[in-house]
Amino acid sequence: MFMNRWLFSTNHKDIGTLYLLFGAWAGMAGTGLSLLIRAELGQPGTLLGDDQIYNVVVTAHAFVMIFFMVMPIMIGGFGNWLVPLMIGAPDMAFPRMNNMSFWLLPPSFLLLLASSMVEAGAGTGWTVYPPLAGNLAHAGASVDLTIFSLHLAGVSSILGAINFITTIINMKPPAMSQYQTPLFVWSVLITAVLLLLSLPVLAAGITMLLTDRNLNTTFFDPAGGGDPVLYQHLFWFFGHPEVYILILPGFGMISHIVTYYSGKKEPFGYMGMVWAMMSIGFLGFIVWAHHMFTVGMDVDTRAYFTSATMIIAIPTGVKVFSWLATLHGGNIKWSPAMMWALGFIFLFTVGGLTGIVLANSSLDIVLHDTYYVVAHFHYVLSMGAVFAIMGGFVHWFPLFSGYTLNDTWAKIHFVIMFVGVNLTFFPQHFLGLSGMPRRYSDYPDAYTTWNTISSMGSFISLTAVVLMVFIIWEAFVSKREVLAVDLTTTNLEWLNGCPPPYHTFEEPAYVNLTS
């Protein structure tokens, strides 16, 4: 029975739960790695050993957080749980493939761990650039294991993307058009399209790297007519859409949370929100070389990538102001989920502003590979993606479990986390402007103060993570059951009660069209 339910599952709710648990578990591993980084950088001098070990930790931290925490939770967890419920589908289009998508992840995670355990580990950074990732600088199996790990995670995501696209297009009630689906469903659809188009390019790049390392091809070796910059183009053609893949489902969740706790029946500017997400998805594919301003591109090329990157600020601005307009005039309920959403809007905007700074190719020449970049992407990930995940979790926890969280503790948790992440990452802007480079385990004494403060912030965040575990435990032992949910007419996922029955929408939903 246990095996049939959890190992061979074809139920979107159970698979979503597996994704959430796996993502939470990986998130703990990723948090542990980040604390190793901040412990090393807490004061000048060496803590862990050499820079190879440090860079293995940094690389693992990135891969774990991106491929095993954010993506499984947002797309696998919330996506599986909510998309079928929101469109009134009985399950995903391909329920068994759905199960395989999940079960490819634990082996992938094990391969990544194995890569750290053999030889010297993969100290390449998450970008895995050759020649550092070649078989001279990284002899042994570490990088090869990392590449296999990425292959598995990539196959998992591609299959999941196919599944979501098919489900969303094909399994709506006959009367429901695409423009009547909730914004979270749209965000997952667009994310899935991005995954489907970008991951094969990554697969090609890392496969060529694999053959360069093991079969003496020279795709990225100038000695044989190759070019390491080709790898950078292939990697970032995936890598830039990837960062939008990480944030788009968050946009969808924030839209739902802000609408719900403003007491509105719909978000402000639904069509604008949809088109903005589609624009972001499209533009995300034509700006990749802004990660490569320092490799010696033509001035006209740099001018194009600078301006194209700045254009993304327009649809992003549409979304931010639409969220604010949704709040406007609403009967605002200061729930923990609303606090996460408001924190998201503010801090994501700050991260977006530093992104506009970095989009300027002239400035980026100076700021590239400094802590300014680290601060930028951690504002949009550690306070964008993670705040969206936390907001979505406390908002939909009653749906998933049938129990309510302790409101007061959840708010305290938010405050601690808010202080922690800001104290960790705000000082890194100063370090970057002062020229402290990324990916080094030690630094000149001049950088000590801000690094110490940053490391203190990371330990405050750790207390927040520990508190979150306690809050979830408290909810399950107290068993406060959900009595009633507001606004179910415009929030279809709550319609079947908390938690919903194992099978929902076994007969097609009746859709009442009102113009």
From Swiss-Prot:
User: Which positions in this protein are listed as binding O2?
Assistant: 244
**UniProt cross-link 1'-histidyl-3'-tyrosine (His-Tyr), position:** 240-244
Identify one Pfam family in the record. COX1
Q: Name one GO biological process term.
A: mitochondrial electron transport, cytochrome c to oxygen
Q: Which residues lie on this side of the membrane: Mitochondrial intermembrane?
A: 41-50, 118-140, 213-227, 287-298, 358-370, 434-446
Pathway(s) this gene product operates in, as recorded in its UniProt entry: Energy metabolism; oxidative phosphorylation
Q: Which GO terms describe its cellular component?
A: mitochondrial inner membrane; respiratory chain complex IV
Q: What does this protein do?
A: Component of the cytochrome c oxidase, the last enzyme in the mitochondrial electron transport chain which drives oxidative phosphorylation. The respiratory chain contains 3 multisubunit complexes succinate dehydrogenase (complex II, CII), ubiquinol-cytochrome c oxidoreductase (cytochrome b-c1 complex, complex III, CIII) and cytochrome c oxidase (complex IV, CIV), that cooperate to transfer electrons derived from NADH and succinate to molecular oxygen, creating an electrochemical gradient over the inner membrane that drives transmembrane transport and the ATP synthase.
Annotated protein name in UniProt: Cytochrome c oxidase subunit 1
The record lists the organism as Hippopotamus amphibius (Hippopotamus)
The uppermost taxa in this organism's lineage are: Eukaryota, Metazoa, Chordata, Craniata, Vertebrata
